[in-house]
């Protein structure tokens, strides 16, 4: 069982979503947004840090997943987004959480099935996947989608690890059978 905190960073609105993963089952724990309406960037970053810290304290996540920075046309916006993202990551690291990063395109591909999905499609699929009665707001839905992507990544990694173990076991059994067969201990009947 793992509790995953997903973050959709922004210098004015930072979405968050928290889910619990038990095997393949995902359970919604909470979501929302940290809103920073002040004009001063350092004060906004301080509020993001305090907000993420409060969420970590409240939900006690085991893992922290965040969207990677994309290349924006406006350099100033990209820099502010990077600073907001870095602030959230520092809050996670200060609470000894492992940090995982996912590209927006991968998140959309995982949750919707299309890497170019729009926000409405992401909201709809998050609502379905987590069996929510109401659609979460856009920034919270994006954060939940990031958490869902991380949960799927964990499941995929476990599946691969189990496949590798099975393959290694099969190879060992095959080698053992070949050894016994070559020594005359086994006879194959056809």
From Swiss-Prot:
It comes from the Bacteria. The RuvA-RuvB-RuvC complex processes Holliday junction (HJ) DNA during genetic recombination and DNA repair. Endonuclease that resolves HJ intermediates. Cleaves cruciform DNA by making single-stranded nicks across the HJ at symmetrical positions within the homologous arms, yielding a 5'-phosphate and a 3'-hydroxyl group; requires a central core of homology in the junction. The consensus cleavage sequence is 5'-(A/T)TT(C/G)-3'. Cleavage occurs on the 3'-side of the TT dinucleotide at the point of strand exchange. The keyword Repeat does not apply. Its cofactor is Mg(2+). The active site is at residues 8, 67, 139. Disulfide bonds: none annotated. GO terms for biological process: DNA recombination; DNA repair. PANTHER family: CROSSOVER JUNCTION ENDODEOXYRIBONUCLEASE RUVC. Belongs to the RuvC family. It is found in: Cytoplasm. GO terms for cellular component: cytoplasm; Holliday junction resolvase complex. Gene3D superfamilies: Ribonuclease H-like superfamily/Ribonuclease H. It holds the Pfam family RuvC. GO terms for molecular function: crossover junction DNA endonuclease activity; DNA binding; magnesium ion binding. SUPFAM superfamilies: Ribonuclease H-like. Binds 2 Mg(2+) ion per subunit. Keywords: Cytoplasm, DNA damage, DNA recombination, DNA repair, DNA-binding, Endonuclease, Hydrolase, Magnesium, Metal-binding, Nuclease. It is an enzyme of class 3 (hydrolase). Its EC number is 3.1.21.10. Mg(2+) 1 binds at residues 8, 139. This is Crossover junction endodeoxyribonuclease RuvC. Mg(2+) 2 binds at residue 67. NCBIfam families: ruvC. Homodimer which binds Holliday junction (HJ) DNA. The HJ becomes 2-fold symmetrical on binding to RuvC with unstacked arms; it has a different conformation from HJ DNA in complex with RuvA. In the full resolvosome a probable DNA-RuvA(4)-RuvB(12)-RuvC(2) complex forms which resolves the HJ. It catalyses: Endonucleolytic cleavage at a junction such as a reciprocal single-stranded crossover between two homologous DNA duplexes (Holliday junction).
């Amino acid at each position: 069982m793992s509790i995953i905190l997903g973050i959709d960073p922004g210098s004015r609105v930072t979405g968050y979503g928290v889910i619990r993963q038990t095997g393949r089952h995902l359970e919604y724990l909470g979501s929302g947004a940290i809103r920073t309406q002040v004009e001063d960037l350092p004060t906004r970053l301080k509020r993001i840090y305090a907000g993420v810290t409060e969420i970590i304290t409240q939900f006690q996540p085991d893992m922290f997943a965040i969207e990677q920075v994309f290349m924006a046309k406006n350099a100033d916006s990209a820099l502010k987004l990077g600073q907001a993202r870095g602030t959230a990551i520092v809050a996670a690291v200060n609470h000894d959480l492992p940090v995982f990063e996912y590209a927006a395109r991968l998140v959309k591909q995982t949750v919707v099935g299309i890497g170019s999905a729009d926000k409405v499609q992401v909201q709809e699929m998050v609502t379905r996947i987590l069996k929510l009665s109401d659609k979460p707001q856009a920034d919270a839905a994006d954060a939940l989608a990031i958490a869902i992507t991380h949960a799927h990544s964990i499941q995929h990694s476990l599946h691969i690890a189990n496949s590798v173990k099975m393959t290694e076991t099969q190879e060992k059994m095959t080698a053992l059978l070949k050894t016994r067969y070559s020594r005359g201990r086994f006879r194959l009947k056809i």
